[in-house]
């Protein structure tokens, strides 16, 4: 096999497969950018958003996006929303500050895991999980512990392909006001790129890494992409290593 493969050809080959995709968490910053990039690249024949409320879009490009409104507290009642998708992207997440400790665990672990279970039962072959740098189920920090726990639990479901993305601090213009995160982003933005890139990453780079990864054939059932790999893959243009 050639050392690299043309990205344009990989994308075209992928489009020819007429695959369908769902996105969990499309109302959040990463999910929103992911949806935009998916539509711009035209990789999937059907795009479905699964969320607790219907989102409104003004742009013509969004007119064919399907939406499934679910109650995450009663996901078993909405199993049909997870049926018939080849690929799934999970960008669900909240913060302890916003939802409290119990609410954070419920969203970032319980909702994610239940959604993955229903997706697997519904025929999803490739599940993509947005996690976090430092995720570790043995961590003493709740945030990293929960992220590590859900990574491991989803792996046990044995998707045909399971991709975990562990970005550092996400650099973006977040829709909701979080002064602490804003200060962190300003801090990383002022640092030399070589240092900042080891601990942070623009949301658009994460999203492009996800999509560049999904189009390249892989033999591994489970793959873990840390922050550096996300940078490398997200910035790839002409070719990709298989």
From Swiss-Prot:
Question: For NADPH, which residues are the binding ones?
Answer: 27-30, 52-53, 92-93, 143, 147, 170, 178
Give the UniProt subcellular location, in the record's own words.
Cytoplasm
The highest taxon in the source lineage is: Eukaryota
User: Looking at the UniProt record for this protein, which Gene Ontology cellular component terms does it annotate, in alphabetical order?
Assistant: cytoplasm; cytosol; nuclear envelope
Residues of the region (Required for interaction with elongation factor EEF1A1) are: 2-25
Q: Where is the signal peptide?
A: none
Q: Which Gene3D superfamilies match?
A: NAD(P)-binding Rossmann-like Domain
Q: Which residues form the active site?
A: 143 (proton acceptor), 147
| Keywords, in A-Z order | Acetylation, Cytoplasm, Disulfide bond, NADP, Translation regulation, Tumor suppressor
Q: Which residues carry this modification: N-acetylalanine?
A: 2
Q: Does the keyword NADP apply?
A: yes
BP-aspect Gene Ontology terms: angiogenesis; apoptotic process; cell differentiation; import into nucleus; positive regulation of programmed cell death; positive regulation of transcription by RNA polymerase II
- What would you give as a GO molecular function for this chain, any one? protein serine/threonine kinase activity
- Identify the InterPro entries for this entry: NAD(P)-bd_dom, NAD(P)-bd_dom_sf
A Pfam family annotated for this UniProt entry = NAD_binding_10
Q: Which PANTHER family does this entry report, sorted A to Z?
A: OXIDOREDUCTASE HTATIP2
The protein's role, per its UniProt record: Represses translation by preventing reactivation of elongation factor eEF1A. May also inhibit nuclear import by competing with nuclear import substrates for binding to a subset of nuclear transport receptors. Has additionally been proposed to act as a redox sensor involved in cellular oxidative stress surveillance.
Name the UniProt record assigns to this protein: Protein HTATIP2
**What organism is listed for this UniProt entry?**
Gorilla gorilla gorilla
- The protein's gene is named HTATIP2
